[in-house]
Design a protein with these regions (language model features):
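Early transmembrane hairpin of solute transport permeases
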Residues: 2-160
Length: 161
């Protein structure tokens, strides 16, 4: 049991390593965009500001797509064979899950108190995952789907058809 917990912890640690680097880049960009620190060179209409804005937006990728990051990286540590294939299976299953939730919400969202017509955002119960407007399941949904995908992969990978 302890080995399984350690494998899960190792699989969760892989994407977390990227958080530190991305956070540092965001912090540096924020400093370089501050006119209080940098002076007039950091005014919002200058090329200096716009270049650092581009770099900062790129650095936000890790935090904006954290669900996908965990869905793809969890099978790296937990799949017993063919890790890359397990990652692809996990990603496809997660996208399928979100498309199915989106279809359910577009038809019957009002029954559960979700207005699917509004924009996805904070406090709405909706999120945009891989450009799919869906129910905001957060990290829990990503980890559950990735866990199911890895379990299915490990159980049925060697099964002959």
């Amino acid at each position: 049991m302890m080995q399984k917990i350690q494998r899960f912890g190792g699989a969760m640690f892989t994407p977390v390593l990227l958080f530190a680097f991305s956070g540092i880049v965001i912090g540096v960009c924020t400093v370089f965009q501050s006119d209080v620190i940098m002076g007039s060179i950091a005014a919002s209409d200058t090329t200096w500001f716009k270049v650092w804005y581009v770099v900062k937006e790129a650095a936000w990728t890790i935090f904006r797509q954290v669900n996908l990051l965990f869905v793809i990286s969890l099978p790296i540590g937990l799949a017993k064979k063919q890790n890359a294939r397990a990652c692809m299976e996990s990603f496809v299953l997660y996208c399928t899950f979100n498309y199915a939730l989106a279809a359910l919400l577009s038809n019957w969202g009002s029954f559960v108190g979700i207005d699917y017509a509004i924009e996805a955002g904070s406090g709405t119960g909706l999120a945009s995952v891989a450009s799919i407007k869906t129910l905001d399941t957060g990290m829990v949904g990503a980890l559950i789907v990735a866990g199911v995908a890895v379990w299915l992969h490990n159980r049925y990978f060697d099964t002959k058809l």
